[in-house]
């Protein structure tokens, strides 16, 4: 029976050591994989505060206020501190543990009476677990890597917050201009409507012309309502980011979107420049934490040796309690491998956690590469659309003037003029949106690469 148990234990330990070797190879391959992206990233200058390239002091203040007041970022900071406390707690197992106690008792014979017998005792104890197999060190390392991962989580939250603040800031700037342009359109159509009413009164126009002009006015007013609702939603988003309540004013004078100079994107920087992304750093840290946890759990097979010492004292009077000191020592050895079934499954659980962390890390690399690639493409398309929108607006202005002249000459209907004018006004709004889309797209690139990249000179 003992031989069978011994053989079973040997097989289990051998299997565990084999699994350890496989996980070690997998972990080293993952580190090598991250290293190649890190080396590519080092070839470029990185400006982490990319929003300052817009040279908008007001935007800078808004971002600073968000970093100071945002609740999601505050919660992420608390998570970082908590992980640090856990890491310190795990590290405490590497140093001796002290404890002490005192006790005073009084006894009296209730039958015979007399004086009470009073005694005072005290003890001071110390224990220390020898980390012969570095199990405790691996546990502490796992906790430290977990702390580093939460730091990167906070950086990811910060990165997302900044991107949201910048894009929402310029979204409101765009919507303000769209509202102003739409109000101009309403005035334009209202003027036409008034002219048609006067002509109708003079008998030189029919009622359908008045109806068509008024229809254009109402359509423009509905567009205005839509833009105002969108601005209110954007303001709500910005207020949430800045932690401002409805009765607190934004105190922001937004720029005109067409006057904002686009920073641009260096498209010569390869999409593989992703090592600065905090989410990837976080997944890499969690992978390291899981690996160290596997190492620590696998060492649960090995004996644990604990050294202990104590110093005890006693006396009948408090001031003489330290006159009698008794020292003691202890050596404890635990054999966890005897509980091999529990240890085995704990090892399996830690290995499964490692594999999950490895897959999450590998997925984060793929997602990041596709993220940058898609954002590059979106930026180039946004620039093209902005250029096309500007050209289209010029053509639409000409077409509107053409139909206006034809109407005034009596060879074209009002409907054709209004249709052309509506197309022109819409293309004017399209320019504003296209410019905002360029800013939004370039910020998506900066966010997905965690900074603005330029070639080192």
Curated annotation (Swiss-Prot):
GO terms for cellular component: cell outer membrane; pore complex. GO terms for biological process: monoatomic ion transport; response to antibiotic. Disruption phenotype: Mutant cannot secrete leukotoxin and is more sensitive to clotrimazole, erythromycin, ethidium bromide, cationic detergents, bile-acids, anionic detergents and chloramphenicol. PROSITE patterns: PROKAR_LIPOPROTEIN. It holds the Pfam family OEP. It comes from the Bacteria. Required for secretion of the LtxA leukotoxin and resistance to various antimicrobial compounds. Homotrimer. Probably part of a complex composed of LtxB, LtxD and TdeA, which forms a single transport channel across the two membranes. The periplasmic domain interacts in vitro with purified peptidoglycans. Belongs to the outer membrane factor (OMF) (TC 1.B.17) family. This is Toxin and drug export protein A. It comes from Aggregatibacter actinomycetemcomitans (Actinobacillus actinomycetemcomitans). The lineage of its organism: Bacteria, Pseudomonadati, Pseudomonadota, Gammaproteobacteria, Pasteurellales. The gene is tdeA.
